[in-house]
A protein has these predicted regions:
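N-terminal loops that bind phosphate or other acidic moieties
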Residues: 1-24, 28-274
Length: 274
């Protein structure tokens, strides 16, 4: 469960922290954030009034939410959540179907978890008066985004947008002709608030072309073209396994960069001819 994350937050609160920023993602959990909230004192009860542990298979069993034991310092604390995706809690683009398979979920398990997540979302709507599926990023980290937004009143911020603002990225773009970004593996998820889409959207606003050099391409990678990325160059130059690709990463990325710039040079020659 996400219980350990809640323990870290509790420790921070116990030590006097009142302005807490949490970057979420890569959780390996799909519990709707119940585990983390349990560590902070919230009780999730079944139909018999028994407290649940807050793991994924409890999503369908939770019948009531008791927030009376929530850590007393939460009301005086400001929580900011940095998140690199804007997926909702449920649905085809939600926490379970988007990220569940990479966490080991089989199709049968994913269907069961999704039904549990739908039930959990409905209970939150009933008890807290909040439709979590209307909160961008509520499906991040297996639903941690939803729990932080609802129970901690956290402000959700795009992780990449926050970082780009911190480094004054827009100012760095002044006088720039081309931006090159990258990702280990680019696929349809990359269009949902991840680094390439964040950078591409900023570049598009200023009319600056941007390309991505990536380790590999996955399903619907071309969706990134709607977010300011003009082209994708892969590093792989032949049949090879992941271990070899990682071992030769520096060499492969250098080769991909050279191919990218040769293509740009060819484009400049075409422009000269016109």
């Amino acid at each position: 469960t996400s219980y350990g994350t809640g323990e870290l937050i509790k420790t921070a609160l116990d030590r006097g922290c009142r302005d807490i920023t949490i970057a979420i993602g890569g959780s390996a959990t799909n519990d709707g954030g119940m585990g983390a909230m349990r560590a902070l004192g919230i009780r999730f009860l079944d139909e018999n009034g028994e407290e649940l542990s807050g793991c994924g298979n409890d999503l369908a069993r939770v019948a009531d939410i008791d927030i009376r034991g929530l850590h007393g310092a939460v009301k005086d604390a400001k929580f900011t959540i940095m998140c690199d995706v804007n997926n909702p809690l449920t649905g085809p683009d939600g926490a379970t179907y988007t990220f569940g398979m990479q966490k080991g979920g089989t199709p049968k398990i994913l269907d069961e978890l999704e039904q549990g997540m739908i039930h959990y979302a409905a209970l939150i709507r009933e008890k807290m008066g909040i439709d979590v599926d209307q909160i961008p990023g509520s499906g991040a980290a297996g639903g941690l985004g939803a729990a932080f937004s609802v129970f901690l009143k956290a402000e959700m911020k795009s992780g990449i947008e926050t970082v780009l603002d911190l480094i004054h990225f827009d100012e760095l773009l002044e006088g720039v002709d081309l931006v090159i970004t990258g990702e280990g593996r680019i696929d349809w998820q990359s269009a949902f608030g991840k680094v390439p889409s964040g950078i591409g959207n900023r570049c598009r606003k200023k009319g600056i072309p941007a390309i991505a050099i990536v380790g590999g391409m996955g399903d619907k990678a071309e969706m990134i073209f709607d977010h300011g990325i003009d082209s994708i160059i892969t590093t792989i130059n032949g049949a090879m396994g992941l271990d070899e690709a990682l071992e030769r990463a520096e060499e492969l990325y250098a080769g991909a960069a050279e191919r990218a710039f040769r293509m740009i040079k060819a484009g400049m020659k075409l422009q000269d001819r016109s």
